[in-house]
Every structure is written in structure tokens, then in C-alpha cells.
Curated annotation (Swiss-Prot):
EC number, as in UniProt: 6.1.1.1
Substrates-to-products reaction catalysed: tRNA(Tyr) + L-tyrosine + ATP = L-tyrosyl-tRNA(Tyr) + AMP + diphosphate + H(+)
The protein's name in its UniProt record: Tyrosine--tRNA ligase
Ranges of residues in domain S4 RNA-binding: 352-410
Keywords from the named record: Aminoacyl-tRNA synthetase, ATP-binding, Cytoplasm, Ligase, Nucleotide-binding, Protein biosynthesis, RNA-binding
Protein's gene: tyrS
Residues the record lists as binding ATP: K232
Amino acid sequence: MNIFEELKARGLVFQTTDEEALVKALTEGQVSYYTGYDPTADSLHLGHLVAILTSRRLQLAGHKPYALVGGATGLIGDPSFKDAERSLQTKDTVDGWVTKIQGQLSRFLDFENGDNKAEMVNNYDWFSDISFIDFLRDVGKYYTVNYMMSKDSVKKRIETGISYTEFAYQIMQGYDFYELNDKHNVTLQIGGSDQWGNMTAGTELLRRKADKSGHVMTVPLITDSTGKKFGKSEGNAVWLDADKTSPYEMYQFWLNVMDDDAVRFLKIFTFLSLDEIAEIEKQFDAARHERLAQKILAKEVVTLVHGEEAYNQALNITEQLFAGNIKNLSAKELKQGLSNVPNYAVQAEDNLNIVELLVTSGIVNSKRQAREDVQNGAIYVNGERVQDLDYTLSDSDKIDGELTVIRRGKKKYSVLTY
């Protein structure tokens, strides 16, 4: 099975320009290819991971990746399938995001070894040297307005309005391909399926300005089995930055994917062989309640993104919280595991009697309810049941001197911080 066949078998090929020519190029020698990442935030997220890992697979097959971070295009804003104009960011902000994103990409691609080691490029390096007049003469001349208006990403914005700034985005991305082809012999661009219009603007410029052909391959935008856009948890993006989405939160995200998605996601997001995944699928189908596919998926992706130590910590937090063993975890681990539960900062003047504190912190609405809960055995302090109405929190209840975990009933957690 050649690399293109494997990508197809994993569900990673959505659309290509001349497929026969692309397969021929990939099987006959080393291809230099690029994937672009615009800095629209200070971190990449799971939505980017499909293209990143596809780029890694091609590198492992001997091809040479260029990771383009859009220091220039990030200042403009991609209109593709966005309902409204993006807010323009300052250059200092975008530069900061570029640096962080470059650091994240270095975890997935090999920038050090072999004749196909990855290279990082920033399109600000060439756009900053082009005058507006030169850009219109040397690039804009090769695009008709009819061609630019025909792009689906533009059509969807015509009725609501699109600025010239965002309208021109596609020819900036097209010029990226031309520049990388001219300087580095890059002949293939990889990106999400929503980028097809922008990407083919590159092959158009190569054809018209340099009389060369280039290839484009898009990866699918991933949805779950219900058709919902993939990569969000509770409506929020799942980030690759551990400070924005902790390894524990990412672990839980993968652990909770639906049965109908688990095996498909193993093919897309892990480097397990297709034979290994087929074997996992057999075991998974025989006992779906054990969630084997989700557990392996969570392990593989968290280890890939954050490392083995972070995976082991996420697994330990999961197991200890499930067992109610709060005291077996550090304050740092508890902050990961309980980041989404209500939090109350204890004040110096607060009464630390359990009944008083349950009301002050908002865990219950009244002292009567608090007394009932304590007497009925529904209140736990750091995993241990408290039934004494006179119980008062002390320093021994402060985990690492930082926090106390209160549980009401089986699942309602709150964190008190000091």
C-alpha cells in the first residue's frame, strides 16, 4: 500500500487536483509539500490536528514538509465560510501567536533529521518586501474578478458583505504557493476542505505566471456521527496548548467520543497501523461497554500531543476521581481534574464551620438544607464523609495548602481555594 492509498484508507483524502498525477508524483520520488497555519489565536486546536498529522504521515513516507505560519495572512483574515468579517489583530499580537504556533508544530514534525527534515517558513518574510503596486502588477494581474467571485467561500459572503481586504486573501494564499514553489520547489499543498478555493488559487497562479502545475489535496473537516463539527468540548475549542486545555481535559474529550466514531478516529488521529486498528475494532465490537477503542484513542492522542508523562497523569487523575480518592491527588492534579466545577475563594473572615461554609460558598441555598445534607451523609470533604454539624475545616483539610474539595452527593463537586 503506497502512502496515498493509506491516506485514503484512513479517510484522510477529501479532494485533490489531478489524482493520477498526484499519486505518480508521490510514488516516484520525494515531494516537497506545505501546509499553512494562520495565527488566529495563541494556540492551534484539534481542528488543525488532521492536517498536521497528515503532514507527519507524508514525512514518514519520505516526503519533505514545509510548515507555513501566516504572519502576513494572519494580519488580513481568511473569509472562508465565516459569517462575518474577522477582527483585525495588531502585528505584535500576531507575531506572538506565530511564535507559539511554531513551537507547537515542532512537536509533530521532524525539523532536525534527514534530507526530508521539515522547514518552518513565515509568509510575512516575503509579503513585507512587496510593494502594493508590485503585488497588483506581478500577482493581481493573473486573477480575474470573475474567477475570484466564483469561489464558494466568497459567494457565501456577497449578500452580507465582504471587505476588499478579505476578498484579496485568496490571492495572498495563492502567492504563498508560488513563492514556495519558486524558492523551494514545493509542488503540493495540503489543507482543510474549506480551503479548496484558496488552495486552487495557488495552482492557478503557478499555471498562469510560471507555466507550471501544482497539486492540492484537502483533508476532510471532521464531524462526529451526528454531523456535529468535531473538536469542541462544551462549546469550547479543544486546544493543543496544555495551559488552555489540560491533558486531563483532552483525555476526557477522547474518552467520551461516541462508539460509532471511535474506530474512525483511531485511523485519523493515531499512528497505529490499519492492521492494529482492525484488531482493536474486533475486540471493541465484542464488548463495547468496556470502551476499549476510546481508551486507546485517548492514550495515543494525549501521548502524541503532550507526552507520556502527561498521559499517565491524566489517567491517574481519572482513576482517583472515579474512586473518590481525592487525597491521593496533588492540588495541581485536582486543578486539572476539577477545572470545570464551581470554585469559591475562601475569605479571611469566612466561618469555616461546615454548615456555614456550605451556604457561604453557594453549594447549598440555606442552613437548613446544609444541616440536612450533613446529617444524611451527603457531604464529603476531600473524599471523606462528614456528618458532624460542628465540623470545622482546618489546615489539615487544605491539600498542599491550596484547596479543599467538597462533594455533595455522588457527583456534585465544588473546590474551595485559599
